[in-house]
UniProtKB/Swiss-Prot annotation:
This is Ribosomal protein L11 methyltransferase. The gene is prmA. One of its GO terms (cellular component) is cytosol. Gene3D superfamilies: Vaccinia Virus protein VP39 (3.40.50.150). The keyword Heme does not apply. Methylates ribosomal protein L11. It comes from Mannheimia succiniciproducens (strain KCTC 0769BP / MBEL55E).
Length: 293
């Protein structure tokens, strides 16, 4: 089935109202895109943040009279003479197949591979984690996830417990188990993350060694030899008392989700209790690791 798309330049204040109206007049989907390549960081739980200059992109059936759509947008005040817009035909494709073709097995460190379930494992003798993009907040493609996976691959995890604080998809906890950890514990504020982690652990045959808790339900006095938290700089600093208490004496801590420009402030929050290693940067992101003093 072919489609036609309209792209409107808007603002964060107007974008959601325009989106609602486009759906009312027949759009089958509406998405938002940054029109100026401006990053957004640290939305609050349940919050949708938009860019100052936001493009609203609506998809319609190819038979739609797009001039009528433009007229309706003008009548409702969503489109004026100063609003840039573009209408274009969208080639019909097997979108599911194209999406799947974009994901390939990825290697992290010396031993670890993350592989989509529909792909053949490149090295059956390696440590292979099968994980599909989708529900999961982290599949190895983001630099912060990659930095954490490489760090875990470089540790001796045999017989140790690993806590994945802000577990999302569970990718870090599952990787730790496959790399030899005795037990892993995933903690998150989002019930959907707990569900995703459980499903991914079952797919990888490690569900019996993974304990999962919502943040408010985690047991008191929980500690582990290795703690990894791939969240964001603000929460990492705010939750320093909580995260630092999870690390056993002489235990290892790995932090990411941090912009390189934020590394200094995060290091300042943790350096009193941890001997920190050199910050490792990738693209605009970084990883901070250290040992509890």
């Amino acid at each position: 089935m072919a489609w036609v798309q309209i792209r409107l330049n808007s603002t964060n204040e107007k974008a959601e109202t325009i989106s609602d109206y486009l759906e009312e007049i027949g759009s089958v989907s509406v998405t938002f895109m940054d029109s100026q390549d401006t990053p957004i960081f640290e939305p609050l739980p349940g919050e949708t943040r938009l860019w100052g200059n936001t493009d609203v992109i609506a998809l319609f059936d190819a038979e739609t009279d797009m001039q009528q759509i433009v007229r309706l947008l003008r009548q409702e005040g969503h489109l004026d003479e100063n609003t840039a817009y573009k209408i274009e035909q969208i080639e019909d494709k097997d979108w599911e197949r194209e999406w799947m073709d974009n994901f390939h097995p990825m290697q992290f460190g010396k031993r670890l591979w993350i592989c989509p379930s529909w792909r053949e494992v490149p090295d059956p003798n390696a440590v292979n984690v099968m994980l599909d993009p989708g529900l999961a907040f982290g599949t190895g493609t983001h630099p912060t996830t990659a930095l954490c996976l490489e760090w875990l691959d470089g540790l001796d995890l045999a017989g140790k417990t690993v806590i994945d604080f802000g577990c999302g998809s569970g990718i870090l906890a599952i990787a730790a188990l496959k790399l030899g950890a005795k037990e892993a514990i995933g903690i998150d504020i989002d019930p959907q993350a707990i569900l995703a982690s459980r499903n991914n652990a079952e797919q990888n045959g490690v569900a019996d060694r993974l304990k999962l808790y919502l943040s408010e339900d985690k047991p008191a006095n929980m500690k582990a030899e290795v703690v990894v938290a791939n969240i964001l700089a603000g929460p990492l600093k705010e939750l320093y008392p909580v995260i630092s208490e999870l690390v056993k004496e002489k235990g290892n801590l790995g932090l990411s989700g941090i912009l390189a420009t934020q590394a200094e402030s995060v290091c300042e929050a943790y350096q009193a209790k941890f001997d920190l290693d050199a910050v490792v940067e990738r693209e605009e992101w970084c990883r901070i690791t250290g040992k509890l003093k």
